[in-house]
Amino acid sequence: MEQIDKQKIADAVKVILEAVGENPEREGLIDTPMRVARMYEEVFAGLKKDPSVHFDTIFEEQHEELVLVKDIRFSSMCEHHLVPFFGVAHVAYLPQNGRVAGLSKLARVVDDVSRRPQLQERITTTVAEIMMDKLKPLGVMVIMEAEHMCMTIRGVNKPGTKTITSAVRGAFKNDDKLRSEVLALIKHN
């Protein structure tokens, strides 16, 4: 995949600084354009990755009960305003035929999908779809809670508000008791 063009980003940041009336050559700002370019390379690293590869290795285990990894911290950039949003993801699945993934792989998929210009709704759906496709579980449930800086520092200016999204597939969609179990475990400390 094509590398991020850091010089092009730095040049654009310099233009933005000039457009808002700043002097990009003054002390404190002189290195800012390249700093921003390096930051974008890091926060958009998911653009260069295929998150589904984390499920290339599947383990056969005699476990067909709920698996939940909760409070996976993530951050992303709102594709509408290019400001951060961040929070936690809770990822649950119900293995089928003993097919389980390494627990860290769930967090890695969340990271790779998040690290690009993105919408929270799309992250939630994409993580669920990748898991259904690669793990072939009986069901998947992904819940994400995040604070969006586009609502906190601009526009409605509502710090502390959280957006919660969910993607519910398979057994979790059809079984209220199973879905309630996941929600109760997420709330449990």
From Swiss-Prot:
Q: Which GO terms describe its cellular component?
A: cytoplasm
Q: Which InterPro entries match?
A: GTP-CH-I_C/QueF, GTP-CH-I_N, GTP_CycHdrlase_I, GTP_CycHdrlase_I_CS, GTP_CycHdrlase_I_dom
**Which Pfam family, an example, fits this chain?**
GTP_cyclohydroI
Protein's UniProt name: GTP cyclohydrolase 1
Family the UniProt entry places it in: Belongs to the GTP cyclohydrolase I family.
UniProt entry tagged with the keyword Amino-acid biosynthesis: no
Q: What is its EC number?
A: 3.5.4.16
| Keywords, in A-Z order | GTP-binding, Hydrolase, Metal-binding, Nucleotide-binding, One-carbon metabolism, Zinc
Q: Which PROSITE patterns match?
A: GTP_CYCLOHYDROL_1_1, GTP_CYCLOHYDROL_1_2
Q: Organism's domain of life?
A: Bacteria
The entry marks the following residues as binding Zn(2+), namely C78, H81, C150
The UniProt catalytic activity note for this protein reads: GTP + H2O = 7,8-dihydroneopterin 3'-triphosphate + formate + H(+)
Example GO molecular function term?
zinc ion binding
Tell me, how does this one assemble?
Toroid-shaped homodecamer, composed of two pentamers of five dimers.
The record's Gene Ontology biological-process terms are: one-carbon metabolic process; tetrahydrobiopterin biosynthetic process; tetrahydrofolate biosynthetic process
The biological pathway it contributes to is: Cofactor biosynthesis; 7,8-dihydroneopterin triphosphate biosynthesis; 7,8-dihydroneopterin triphosphate from GTP: step 1/1
